[in-house]
Amino acid sequence: MMNINEIKEILPHRYPFLLVDKVEEITESKVVAYKNVTINEPFFQGHFPDYPVMPGVLIVEALAQAGAIALLNKEEFKGKTPFFAGIDKVRFKKQVLPGDTLRLEVEIIKLRGSIGFGKATATVDGKIACSGEIMFAIG
């Protein structure tokens, strides 16, 4: 389990772009984290003012940040900078709205040098909001 202060020790992201609020579970190859989505998120001002929906690209970014926590937790990557290197087979199945708690689960399926590949799923209330494959580069 990690709180926001521990997350900030690992990730270089900061408000308004830090999209992980807590980590519930972390192992060498898997992370389960959460983003509490509130109406106060800056992106809701324009996406969309009369019907606020979390942008899909930010759901994917939240998944990438969660996956980066798993990688940066490894001794050889501590203190390094994570870069989002690619996405594949991403599908959006449910809108994420203010008040939702986004559960972010990333399983690292392959690690080759400083390049990692993960299977990522974001859910709200047990229903898939987004899933796909993500690629990381650690610099």
Swiss-Prot record:
GO terms for cellular component: cytoplasm; membrane. Keywords: Cytoplasm, Lipid A biosynthesis, Lipid biosynthesis, Lipid metabolism, Lyase. It is an enzyme of class 4 (lyase). GO terms for biological process: fatty acid biosynthetic process; lipid A biosynthetic process. It is found in: Cytoplasm. Its main location: cytoplasm. One of its GO terms (molecular function) is (3R)-hydroxyacyl-[acyl-carrier-protein] dehydratase activity. Its EC number is 4.2.1.59. Coiled coil: none annotated. The active site is at H47. CDD domains: FabZ (cd01288). The keyword Lyase applies. It catalyses: a (3R)-hydroxyacyl-[ACP] = a (2E)-enoyl-[ACP] + H2O. Disulfide bonds: none annotated. InterPro entries: FabA_FabZ (IPR013114), FabZ (IPR010084), HotDog_dom_sf (IPR029069). Gene3D superfamilies: Hotdog Thioesterase (3.10.129.10). Involved in unsaturated fatty acids biosynthesis. Catalyzes the dehydration of short chain beta-hydroxyacyl-ACPs and long chain saturated and unsaturated beta-hydroxyacyl-ACPs. Belongs to the thioester dehydratase family. FabZ subfamily. This is 3-hydroxyacyl-[acyl-carrier-protein] dehydratase FabZ. It comes from Clostridium perfringens (strain SM101 / Type A). The lineage of its organism: Bacteria, Bacillati, Bacillota, Clostridia, Eubacteriales.
